Amino acid sequence: SEPFRLYLAVKELSLKYVVITSVDRDDLEDYGAGHYAKCVEFLKSHVPDLRVEVLTPDLRGDERALERVLRAEPDVLAHNIETVERVFRVVRPQGDYRRSLRVLKFYSKEGSAPVKSGIMVGLGETKEELISTFQDLLEAGVSYLVIGQYLSPGRGYYPVRKHYSKEEFDELRDIALSMGFKRVLSEPLARSSYHAQEIAGL
């Protein structure tokens, strides 16, 4: 089973911190929440000192599915907002910006673990829209924020509208920290699982 295979990988690699994620599984009745929970529970029961972060899809905002993830007691709860609301409809038509915020808020209110989210820049957003999104995330209870550069996978995909400079990433980090985030990673190649243990402080 996958939980057991994850356990073997953790033991072989002597890992102390893992991030479990997946693609959307809207084809499953619980959107994959039960499998997330089984993986977390198996790992934490067999490797007691292991810290586990989950990076989940929105699970369609289904509270029963979200609650199932919470009951497994991961150490960090993550769901990526990805982009600002105006651009969200274009680049993630299958998703919903407000639903993602509701997921993050549910994790924050109903769970005990810190909540984390990630956003990509370079999709045509404005600085004002980024600041507004940061505020939305704070109001949803997000503590940790990751900001990275959007890189188009290739032809036929949404194009990169802007490449941010290191100075601009530093500025966004400083803005986010001043607004109240506890930890912020803001770098061109940063992704939500990048330096996850350091961000979590575990």
Q: PLM features: residue spans?
A:
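Short, ordered loop/turn segments at secondary-structure junctions
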Residues: 23-25, 57, 81-84, 149-150, ...
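Conserved glycine-rich "GG(E/T)P / GGGxP" loop and the immediately following alpha-helix
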Residues: 18-38, 124-129
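Extended interfacial segments that mediate partner engagement and assembly in macromolecular machines
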Residues: 2-13, 17-26
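A short acidic, helix-capping loop that chelates divalent metal ions and anchors anionic groups
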Residues: 24-29, 85-91, 153-159, 195
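Auxiliary Fe-S-binding modules of radical SAM enzymes
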Residues: 4-5, 11-14, 38-50, 64, ...
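Hydrophobic residues within beta-strands of alpha/beta enzymes
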Residues: 18-20, 52, 77-79, 145, ...
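Active-site-adjacent beta->alpha loops and helix N-cap segments on the catalytic face
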Residues: 27-39, 62, 86-87, 91-102
